[in-house]
From Swiss-Prot:
The active site is at D75. The gene is nadK. Belongs to the NAD kinase family. It holds the Pfam family NAD_kinase. This is NAD kinase. The lineage of its organism: Bacteria, Pseudomonadati, Pseudomonadota, Betaproteobacteria, Burkholderiales.
Amino acid sequence: MQVTSQFKTVALVGRNNTPGIAEPLTALASCIAKRGFEVVFEADTAAEIGVTDYPALRPAEIGARADVAVVLGGDGTMLGIGRQLAPYRTPLIGINHGRLGFITDIPISDMREIVPQMLSGNFEREERVLLEARIMRGGNPIYHALAFNDVVVNRSGFSGMAELHVSVDGRFMYNQRSDGLIVATPTGSTAYALSSQGPILHPQLQGIVLVPIAPHALSNRPIVLPDDSKVSIQIVSGREVNVNFDMQSFTSLELGDTIEVRRSRHTVPMLHPVGYSFFTTLRKKLHWNEYPSHEEDSKP
């Protein structure tokens, strides 16, 4: 079949260590290939499920060769491959094979119908921002990473509170004693930040949210900053303080270290089915608009 879509090569990425994922991945590959698209697999995914019929590529090779990546997994899978493909601006399509699925929005039961439609051009596109962070020690950068959801400075499970000196654009904001601080993108506002009583930011809102984790002072509240802000967090006191990036990679910190966080120049293009609504996602995932029936109200 002749392909007339803007997409020619489609990469498939699967959630690692997931029993039963081989069947839907290979079925989707066959479905896409029959429509004339070239199909490639992410190398770790191919090795895990034993795929040999399609090329197996590393993320950098996918970025250079594929026109779109279809991700079958949970939000964590999407975050991981999204960070790696962001420099290549490879669009992502997410199929939910996890639990919550805020950014993998296509039900696995509908993938064979919806994904081919999207590859044929029937989709809605949006750009999701990333954060970039670097750790400064003694005035020198020692670590650098991207984050799709959030950069989290926090204490380990058995240590006391950490004291953090926080400034924005070089201006002192506050000293905070807490279990940590979350710096989140709008995408990340529905992740760890939400469970720490942070606000939900619409994905198209240009902002960065700071959310304290169990602060000592109840007056320490979340705050939304302009997305061109530079946030600096210095470790004043505390034992075993770490910084996590999307809760998928981390590094240990020392007293005096400073974490500098700002919006990355990279964005992640995400494709959704026609009719996609962020508010529908919130209703479904957070169980909004669900009220007990009158019968339930009348039960003793």
